[in-house]
């Protein structure tokens, strides 16, 4: 035990000289056991040790005093192993046996091979001498040593940086505020009302001499704990350290009273900020001292100038009246002012009468005829009554134009000392307490005072504003306001207070007469229609029939969980309590749990009820009529709900509400404001000079593009005359990723994010939705991959043919996207767009292993470096073009009608039987079936040979006399043909509609027959369908093979020729060329003078010439013009 306790010390203090005392024993599978001896056992010989495969213990031959320390490969921690005394074989025998013999499982052959390779690496490794500890050296656990830099053998480490942590000041910022990154200061996200308190302030306390002028200076009033009642040393808040202060350090001081919206003051032992006005969103917080606190810190409050007072008054009045252009501070004041406009309108419109005024009054003395007076006002002196009328007439003007002065924040207010003064007028205006019981006996004897007619002068005064009576004192104004508030309170109590309640049905009334009138409905007196079951009386038969439904067998309220039904909803709510399981209701259909009966009732009605309400416009059905009405709005064009912020219109009110919550919420507006102040870092785009490195290229402008849409936009703007089918990159399929979307709450898997979202909303209500892939931001250094939170997995790619818009140059990967584009960009064609949708372009894939024919006629293996995009996209498009391939050995028959000579008629039609041949570039032996070879990116694009595969055709030709008259202009003529060429239209020619094919004369053909490949002078290869357009060949070269009419050779000619042309991209027309070979020409070495050179570019075409002698032997030559 002592040896084991000292093992860690011996291990850590081992030096270079102690390596002999710590032998390492190598076992199979790369396991290493190291024996650490104690101090007095260092001279012992090596012990025979077997390291167990499970890593829990080891076995020694004898009870030696040593400790075996196991180093965990995962984290490098050390642990001691228990000792088991047992006699074991020698090391050689132990090492020859597999270590994993204790396990029940047997390793496979592949795992044994991997273990052998690991053993070989461990055998080659030799530990270095342990270097002394130096903090400048980097430790390598694999080498068990330190290095001055990265380990040379094992390479550099893979660092994972710490996640950045915000400072205390920024982390403590409330959610309703944000700090501007560029301007500085604290701004609001939403409206903050007046009298909102922030704080307390946190920060270190220092002396005044250590303060900085960049922040507001705040002093803390403190008492000395040792000396009672005496102040301690003055200490100030240091607001310069973000790690020790909270967010209030970022609030900047106000320069004047106009921009100040916070006051700083000390309450207790803390400093707080309080808002002195309503702070609007996106407004900065500016603080200054309160009046008393400013005197404490030897500062002055900001004086309010007359201009600032006007601005403040206009800012506070945010409720304008559209009748008289006045503004008010609150909606209540505006509503009271609008009532005054209503009174004026009623007084002006109604005619005069000698009786009492019938105009609408809010709080007048006029009463409805036959209505008794409830509350009486005691008699007041005449002077007080006149003054009261004056107050009531001018109270509206006072309430909205009152100006307050005072000592608070420098504002001048009227002295409030007069508030405590009690005058006789105040006593007269304050009525004594009145008891309702004492007034009921006097109600009959009291008559209301007469109301005189309002003179015309008074009506004229009501139509316009007039200044306040200067004789009214502030006390009179306050008393008038109290009278009006008391009247409003009385009106509210009168409307809401219902003390008289019916004992039978529980209905409440404000008056006793109403209750007595209601009680007659419960008895037989005064009611002709009486219920024979409960005795309740009704005034009409309709009301009785509605009541009898409650006593019928058809119960209206049935239980969802059993067969019980009730005539009242209250009884049903009491009953459903017995169906609760652990405080929750379980849906009888899907076993979902709900805490409220209303929720489970809505769930059953929405998802498990029968859909009987069918839509007349479509096939959808609903279980409720209100849902059907909402759905019918989809088929209408009316949009009655308008967003007042952005002007967008909606058909449904709930959609408008969702729009307001999603697009115009305060947090989003605050983010927009923050985004406006941000300046995007301008990245200087350096145009690349490697044109071939781009996937999508415009060869007319020699410009490359990274994306397909950029090339389409470029062609539509710069080259509108060019068709998209003429660009080979735009005919290639579109590669889209294919993903699986997993539900993180169950085992469901979906192919689209929208279906997964609908599943979560329906089956997991209230659960959090996974983030959208489109809104993910790249992870920073040390942060986890954001794709892990989306619960998606990439399962492969899908190659789809592009779908072109019939009205513009746009291309889309699916028909649905294209239809959406038409509805948005071409609404005039959305109803007939289905018939004009272009079918996806078909891409032909060629796969073959042909021979390569060189210029000397021999067949050799060619190493062709193909274009990276062409080869990769060709392999990807193989899955799409199976239907367009023609099986090997299939024959197609075409009919060719030649044109006779001048004055001659049409010759007999000739049928040419052509065998389809698949031609592809020869595969490189170094590619190893690899689609992308990095070495091809910088190879020069110079090609001198390509693959040509030759097959046979059979020609059924008529008599020689008819053939002699057949002549076609624009095609290569035979050496014996000396007649003038005649133009042949493309409508009369029937070209072979298969690309990348060459023809060769059959070896058993009639001697003297001549084979031609014709290309008319007006032939344009871009106008043909996509099947015969440019195919994938090296250097974007394309073979155009055509069948020709056999022409009888001359008598002295023993050789015939067949010519094929290879044209490159960008060459719109290819004129026919006459290739003549003298009869004495040597086979295999054609004269260069035979090649046509008239007006042809050197890099636009290749000419393939096949020479056949009289014996049937043929030879092929590839030359450049």
UniProtKB/Swiss-Prot annotation:
Compositionally skewed regions (Acidic residues) per UniProt: 106-124
Predominant localisation class: nucleus
Protein localization: Nucleus
Span of domain SET: 173-290
Short name of any one Pfam family annotated for the protein: PRDM2_PR
Function: Transcriptional activator, essential for early embryonic development and survival of embryonic stem cells (ESCs). Supports cell growth and survival during early development by transcriptionally activating the expression of the translation initiation factor EIF3B, to sustain global translation. Activates the transcription of FLNC.
BP-aspect Gene Ontology terms: methylation; positive regulation of DNA-templated transcription; positive regulation of transcription by RNA polymerase II
Protein name, UniProt field: PR domain zinc finger protein 10
Domain of life: Eukaryota
Family according to the record: Belongs to the class V-like SAM-binding methyltransferase superfamily.
Species annotation: Danio rerio (Zebrafish)
Segments of this protein annotated with the region Disordered: 1-24, 92-125, 350-387, 419-473, 1077-1097
Molecular functions (GO terms): DNA binding; DNA-binding transcription factor activity; methyltransferase activity; zinc ion binding
């Amino acid at each position: 035990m002592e040896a084991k306790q000292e093992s860690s010390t011996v291990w850590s203090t081992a030096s270079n000289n102690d390596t002999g005392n710590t032998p390492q024993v190598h076992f199979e599978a790369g396991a290493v056991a190291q024996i650490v001896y104690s101090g007095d056992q260092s001279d012992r010989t090596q012990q025979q040790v077997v390291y167990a495969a499970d890593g829990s213990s080891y076995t020694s031959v004898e009870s030696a005093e040593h400790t075996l320390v196991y180093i965990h490969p995962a984290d490098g921690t050390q642990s001691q192993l228990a000792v088991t005394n047992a006699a074991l074989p020698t090391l050689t025998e132990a090492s020859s046996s597999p270590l994993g013999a204790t396990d029940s499982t047997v390793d496979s052959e592949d795992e044994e091979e991997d273990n052998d390779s690991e053993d070989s690496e461990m055998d080659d490794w030799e530990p270095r001498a342990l270097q002394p500890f130096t903090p400048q050296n980097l430790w390598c656990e694999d080498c068990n040593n330190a290095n001055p830099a990265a380990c040379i053998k094992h390479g550099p480490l893979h660092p994972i940086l710490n996640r950045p942590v915000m400072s205390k000041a920024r982390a403590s910022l409330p959610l309703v505020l944000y700090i501007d990154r560029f301007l500085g200061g604290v701004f609001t996200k939403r409206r903050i009302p007046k009298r909102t308190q922030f704080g307390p302030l946190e920060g270190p306390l220092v002396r005044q001499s250590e303060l900085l002028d960049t922040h507001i200076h705040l002093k803390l009033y403190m008492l000395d704990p040792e000396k009672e009642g005496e102040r301690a040393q003055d200490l100030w808040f240091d607001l310069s350290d973000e790690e020790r202060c909270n967010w209030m350090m970022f609030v900047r001081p106000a320069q004047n009273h106009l921009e100040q919206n916070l006051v700083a003051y000390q309450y207790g032992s803390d400093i707080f900020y309080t808002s002195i006005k309503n702070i609007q969103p996106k407004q900065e917080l500016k603080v200054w001292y309160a009046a008393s606190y400013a005197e404490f810190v030897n500062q002055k409050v900001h004086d309010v100038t007359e201009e600032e007072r006007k601005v403040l008054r206009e800012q506070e009045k945010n409720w304008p009246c559209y009748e008289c252009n006045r503004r008010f501070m609150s909606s209540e004041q505006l509503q009271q002012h609008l009532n005054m406009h209503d009174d004026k309108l009623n007084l002006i419109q109604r005619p005069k009468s000698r009786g009492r005024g019938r105009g609408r009054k809010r709080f007048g003395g006029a009463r409805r005829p036959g209505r008794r007076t409830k509350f009486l006002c005691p008699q007041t002196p005449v002077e007080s009554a006149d003054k009261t009328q004056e107050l009531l007439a001018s109270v509206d003007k006072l309430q909205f134009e009152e100006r307050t002065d005072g000592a608070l924040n420098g504002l001048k207010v009227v002295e409030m000392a007069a508030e405590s003064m009690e005058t006789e007028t105040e006593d007269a205006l304050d009525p004594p307490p009145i008891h309702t019981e004492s007034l009921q006996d006097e109600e009959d004897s009291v008559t209301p005072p007469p109301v005189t007619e309002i003179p015309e002068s008074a009506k004229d005064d009501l139509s316009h504003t007039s200044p306040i009576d200067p004789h009214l004192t502030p006390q009179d104004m306050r008393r008038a306001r109290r009278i009006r508030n008391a009247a409003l309170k009385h009106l509210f109590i009168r409307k809401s207070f219902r003390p008289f309640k019916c004992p039978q049905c529980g209905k409440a009334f404000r008056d006793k007469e109403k209750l007595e009138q209601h009680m007659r409905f419960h008895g037989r007196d005064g009611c002709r229609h009486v219920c024979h079951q409960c005795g309740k009386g009704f005034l009409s038969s309709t009301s009785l029939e509605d009541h009898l439904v409650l006593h019928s067998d058809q119960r209206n309220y049935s239980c969802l969980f059993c067969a019980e039904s009730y005539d009242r909803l209250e009884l049903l709510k009491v009953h459903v309590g017995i169906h609760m399981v652990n405080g929750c209701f379980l849906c009888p259909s899907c076993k979902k749990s709900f805490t409220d009966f209303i929720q489970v009732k809505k769930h059953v009605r929405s998802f498990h009820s029968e859909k009987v309400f069918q839509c007349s416009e479509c096939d959808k059905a609903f279980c409720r009529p209100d849902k059907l009405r909402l759905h019918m709005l989809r088929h209408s064009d009316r949009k009655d709900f308008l967003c007042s912020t952005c002007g967008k219109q909606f058909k449904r009110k709930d959609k408008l509400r969702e729009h307001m919550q999603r697009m115009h919420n305060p947090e989003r507006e605050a983010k927009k404001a923050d985004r406006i102040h941000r300046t995007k870092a301008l990245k200087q785009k350096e145009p690349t000079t490697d044109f071939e490195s781009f996937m999508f290229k415009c060869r007319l402008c020699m410009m490359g593009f990274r994306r397909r849409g950029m090339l389409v936009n470029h062609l539509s703007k710069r080259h509108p005359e060019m068709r998209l089918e003429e660009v080979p990159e735009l005919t290639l399929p579109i590669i889209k990723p294919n993903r699986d979307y997993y539900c993180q709450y169950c085992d469901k898997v979906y192919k689209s994010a929208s279906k997964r979202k609908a599943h979560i909303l329906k089956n997991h209500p209230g659960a959090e939705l996974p983030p959208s892939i489109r809104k993910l931001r790249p992870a920073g250094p040390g942060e986890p991959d954001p794709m892990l939170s989306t619960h998606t997995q990439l399962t492969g790619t899908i190659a789809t043919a592009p779908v072109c818009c019939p009205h513009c140059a746009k291309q889309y990967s699916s028909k649905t996207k294209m239809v959406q584009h038409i509805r948005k960009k071409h609404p005039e064609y959305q109803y007939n767009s289905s018939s004009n949708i272009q079918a996806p372009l078909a891409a032909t894939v060629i796969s073959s292993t042909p021979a390569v024919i060189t210029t000397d006629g021999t067949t050799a293996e060619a190493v062709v470096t193909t274009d990276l995009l062409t080869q990769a996209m060709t392999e990807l498009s193989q899955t799409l073009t199976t239907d367009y391939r023609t099986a090997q050995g299939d024959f197609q028959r075409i009919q060719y009608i030649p044109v006779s000579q001048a004055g001659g008629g049409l010759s007999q039609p000739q049928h040419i039987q052509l065998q389809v041949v698949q031609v592809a570039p020869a595969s490189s032996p170094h590619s190893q079936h690899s689609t992308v070879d990095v070495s091809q990116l910088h190879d020069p694009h110079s090609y001198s040979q390509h693959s040509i595969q030759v097959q046979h055709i059979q020609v059924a030709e008529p008599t020689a006399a008819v053939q002699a008259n057949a002549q076609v202009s624009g095609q290569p003529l035979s050496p014996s043909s000396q007649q003038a060429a005649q133009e042949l239209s493309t409508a009369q020619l029937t070209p072979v509609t298969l690309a990348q094919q060459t023809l060769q004369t059959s070896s058993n053909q009639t001697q003297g027959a001549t084979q031609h490949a014709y290309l008319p002078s007006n032939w344009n290869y871009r106008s043909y369908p996509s099947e015969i357009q440019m195919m994938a060949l090296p250097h974007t070269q394309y073979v155009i093979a055509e069948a020709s009419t056999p022409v009888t050779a001359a008598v002295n000619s023993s050789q015939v020729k067949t010519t094929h042309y290879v044209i490159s991209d960008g060459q719109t027309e290819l004129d026919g060329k006459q290739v003549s070979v003298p009869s004495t020409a040597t086979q295999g070495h054609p004269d260069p003078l035979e090649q046509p050179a008239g007006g042809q570019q050197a890099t636009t075409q290749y000419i393939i010439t096949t020479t056949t002698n009289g014996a049937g032997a043929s030879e092929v030559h590839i030359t450049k013009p």
